[in-house]
Amino acid sequence: MGLPWYRVHTVVLNDPGRLLAVHIMHTALVAGWAGSMALYELAVFDPSDPVLDPMWRQGMFVIPFMTRLGITNSWGGWSITGGTITNPGIWSYEGVAGAHIVFSGLCFLAAIWHWVYWDLEIFCDERTGKPSLDLPKIFGIHLFLSGVACFGFGAFHVTGLYGPGIWVSDPYGLTGKVQSVNPAWGVEGFDPFVPGGIASHHIAAGTLGILAGLFHLSVRPPQRLYKGLRMGNIETVLSSSIAAVFFAAFVVAGTMWYGSATTPIELFGPTRYQWDQGYFQQEIYRRVGTGLAENQSLSEAWSKIPEKLAFYDYIGNNPAKGGLFRAGSMDNGDGIAIGWLGHPLFRDKEGRELFVRRMPTFFETFPVVLVDGDGIVRADVPFRRAESKYSVEQVGVTVEFYGGELNGVSYSDPATVKKYARRAQLGEIFELDRATLKSDGVFRSSPRGWFTFGHASFALLFFFGHIWHGSRTLFRDVFAGIDPDLDAQVEFGAFQKLGDPTTRRQVV
């Protein structure tokens, strides 16, 4: 046809057979990418330390999505929760990846078949003999089938009636595992952090989809509505489909960035708001306070804090700390976490307990300031020593560790105290291996950040695509230069200006 590059799919506009072919090929590409990406991630994934080197620290992108849907075992003999297994079954990580690749191959062959055999009887209008699609009927079919899939997922897969269930965890991401979920039909089902809402909403939405699909299969649209919404134009389908996709992309960008039951922190990493609000820090202090109330020593109380909980309370796991254009996993940034050094407790020479003010998310550098329990500044690391009043040396600050690898160790040397005060700005202190991956020490974002950025960006792009194609289909006659109020039969080529009888061409 000699179309320019930006006309992309115009070639299949009036060709239902090949329109179907390119959509099947698109599905083949998507499924093929998913399967291949899964195999690549499995090849580089290290499952040995699910606490300090989980999937999200390693930059895994598709493994978390498989895991939240109930896949936990590998044909390599490991489980995502740690330990070894002997019989992973067919639906392991590799099994799912292989199924996607096989499906991709079948779609590839189907796409070729439909490209070659494009002129099928099913695409022909009996009355005119020309290629034609009954778009309202196709809409009904798709709505019905997607409703069945949606209902089936909620009623069988999520509930464990016929399926594994989904990943469910506690609010602090410590006890996560795959389990069946009962639908939440009360008001609690609208809480985005309640897993039961996933089951109930899929059942409800699926039921609605089935009923709506049957409605559109059995009821024809009124002529005025059909013409007003251009229901006979395939570009209307494109426009409304893009709308559905960009709306979904905006929704999942939100649920990922702000957190929800569908995006567990064990699989995707914590959210930035958990750092901003001191979410894990408060829980750690609550547990320590409970231990002290039970007559435990500080050392005993801090030693009972799970390493996993302490690791969440570290700024390097904040997805907003990594720049959008810093490629690589979190492990490539600050390194692979080896162990928790323990909680540093600072005191001045008068015995007051001091707390290091933590670095806010969007700061790269931050002054080291130590405050007492009332928030009064008692010590700092000054920029200009000549004018300092609260320096570590002047105030006589010491540090002692509780829990972790340095449990019971104390330091009074100012240089060492300042070193740990600087590190305490970043939350709990961990030993990090930067040699293995040649990590550069610059923070990276987690898959939570990448997913959000990608989906928000494409949602914005697709929003403009919806406006573009929607206006093209609604105002097609205007763009073509044909007056919609013109009743007379227009003979193309009879006038110099289309539809203007005053410009009739003169026959010489």
From Swiss-Prot:
Source organism superkingdom: Eukaryota
Gene3D superfamilies: Photosystem II CP47 reaction center protein (3.10.680.10)
An individual GO BP term: photosynthetic electron transport in photosystem II
Record-level Gene Ontology MF annotations: chlorophyll binding; electron transporter, transferring electrons within the cyclic electron transport pathway of photosynthesis activity
Principal location: plastid
Localization terms from the record: Plastid, Chloroplast thylakoid membrane
Membrane topology: Multi-pass membrane protein
One term under GO cellular component: photosystem II
Alphabetical UniProt keywords: Chlorophyll, Chloroplast, Chromophore, Membrane, Photosynthesis, Photosystem II, Plastid, Thylakoid, Transmembrane, Transmembrane helix
Bound cofactor: record note: Binds multiple chlorophylls. PSII binds additional chlorophylls, carotenoids and specific lipids.
Purpose: One of the components of the core complex of photosystem II (PSII). It binds chlorophyll and helps catalyze the primary light-induced photochemical processes of PSII. PSII is a light-driven water:plastoquinone oxidoreductase, using light energy to abstract electrons from H(2)O, generating O(2) and a proton gradient subsequently used for ATP formation.
Protein name, as recorded: Photosystem II CP47 reaction center protein
Annotated organism of origin: Populus trichocarpa
